[in-house]
Amino acid sequence: MAKDRYVGVVPPIVTPVDKFERVDEAALRGIVRRCKDVGLHGVFVAGSNGECMALTQAERNRAIRIVLDEAGPDYPVMSGVMDSSTQRVIDNIKALEDMGGDVAVVTPVFYARHATQDETVRHFEEILRHTKVKLMIYNIPMFTGLNLTPETIIRIAELDSRVIGCKDTSGNFPGFQKLLRHFKDSDFILHQGSTNLAAASMLLGADGFVPSLAPVFPKVHLKVYQFGKAGNIAETMKWNELLSDVCTLYPMAKSQTSSTKYAMSKVCPMSYRSILPTEPITQSEMAQIDALMD
């Protein structure tokens, strides 16, 4: 059952690259090993934090292939397949199927124009018709231009049992609560994508959250998950105060990915280079992150 496997603290891992913007295989394998070793419940590869749309298609697929291989069959991996048209997403999923992946994370289409709610339902209908893997809905309006309503997410979930869940990074907590009420006691997985809402979401019945800094600060993220899942309000809020401090790291560089990559480089051997045209992290920004981590 998917709900026994794809829940918990599942970070969207960064993609380490060399000066030619090719995936650094050894470093990426090291990130996956760290996630496993510190007790995180799985990984999300080729997400926004993994610079999925900045990588070339070949390098994006290579990153997914490396992560699936390093994770092995027993460690959950969710793979980003988001793209600008339905057929492109289908092609990405077929490549994922060939690599042995079993969960594809799918957003509404984007770039040329913003999709509507109905178009996004049709997007998922067509994907389901032509692919075999499980699908995770990804609501991230800051990048797609469309905030999926709870009603649309419910419609998509009802299309097929292969739609196993939703990662909601909309920041719309009332909408997320509506989903929690609707899917209570079901097998549908609800992941909170906004870390600042993780504690409240866990206490109200979420199945997990997807924080990019979890491999850097695993204990605080796992404690919020564990105590939130157990309904221990006092302990959840105590650990959430520390989590709020951790989250001040995100805006310390001009790009959240740059901040996260630099922080990751302090716990895993890897370059903190971001993909062009992202501005490189500065010495003063690094000093702020060093001070927080020390």
Segment roles from a protein language model:
Residues L28, R60, I64, V89, ...:
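A general structural signal for well-ordered alpha-helical segments in protein cores
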Residues R22, A54, A58, H114, ...:
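Charge-dense, low-complexity intrinsically disordered segments
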Residues D74-Y75, K134, V163, S186, ...:
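Secondary-structure boundary/capping positions in well-ordered alpha/beta enzyme cores
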Residues G8-V14, V38-L40, L203-A206, L213, ...:
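C-terminal alpha-helical cap/extension of soluble enzyme domains
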Residues F143-S244, Y250-P251:
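Catalytic alpha/beta core domains of metabolic enzymes, predominantly
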Residues A2-R5, F188, M264:
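Catalytic cores of TIM-barrel enzymes
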Residues V38, R62, I66-A71, A95-M99, ...:
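Alpha-helical structural signal in soluble globular domains
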Residues K3-P11, T15-N147:
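Active-site beta->alpha loop and helix N-cap motifs at the rims of alpha/beta catalytic domains
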